[in-house]
């Protein structure tokens, strides 16, 4: 989906690492979500505006009200180091970057297990108008993304056209 394309035809819009939010793209996301869309983004989103200048007022910048969170700090993990979080009773790795999240209306779905930000949300969902906005504050495993995105798709009534066996893409 391009920045100029309509979001409304899609039940779910996933925009991982939406580092740059150009112009009024936040308004497009805001309207889409308010009117019942499901928006998913991740760590390192809303960091800069269209001229690559840092967004003032905290992250995820112009998406802050939609996501219902603000990011106080980003912990960059050295290569080979991991934190972890528990989601629905299963532990998953938190890798690369870990956003230290404070909720502003969003509901935490999981929390970090280690380091000085243990207990801080790792994944959140915010009800926004008729829609929902999910924020994934870290890089994780394929198993985690599979679990979360399957649940989001089921919630939105989105199903695959074909059922494929495991290990087939």
Where are the model-predicted features located?
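Conserved acidic residues
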Residues: 11
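A conserved amphipathic helix/loop scaffold
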Residues: 8, 16-169
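A short, well-structured beta->alpha microelement
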Residues: 1-6
């Amino acid at each position: 989906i391009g920045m100029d394309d309509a979001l409304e035809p899609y039940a779910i819009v996933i925009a991982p690492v939406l580092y740059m939010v150009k112009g009024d793209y936040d308004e497009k996301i805001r309207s889409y979500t308010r009117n019942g869309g499901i928006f998913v983004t991740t760590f390192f989103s809303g960091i800069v505006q269209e001229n690559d200048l840092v967004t003032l007022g905290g992250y995820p910048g112009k998406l802050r009200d939609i996501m219902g969170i603000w990011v106080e700090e980003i912990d960059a993990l050295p290569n080979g180091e991991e934190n972890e979080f528990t989601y629905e009773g299963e532990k998953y790795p938190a890798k690369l970057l870990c956003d230290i999240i404070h909720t502003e209306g969003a509901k935490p779905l999981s929390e970090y297990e280690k380091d000085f930000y243990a207990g801080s949300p790792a994944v959140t969902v915010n009800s926004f108008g008729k829609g929902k906005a999910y924020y994934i504050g870290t890089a994780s495993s394929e198993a985690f993304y599979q679990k979360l995105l399957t649940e989001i798709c089921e919630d939105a009534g989105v199903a695959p056209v074909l059922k494929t066996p495991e290990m087939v893409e």
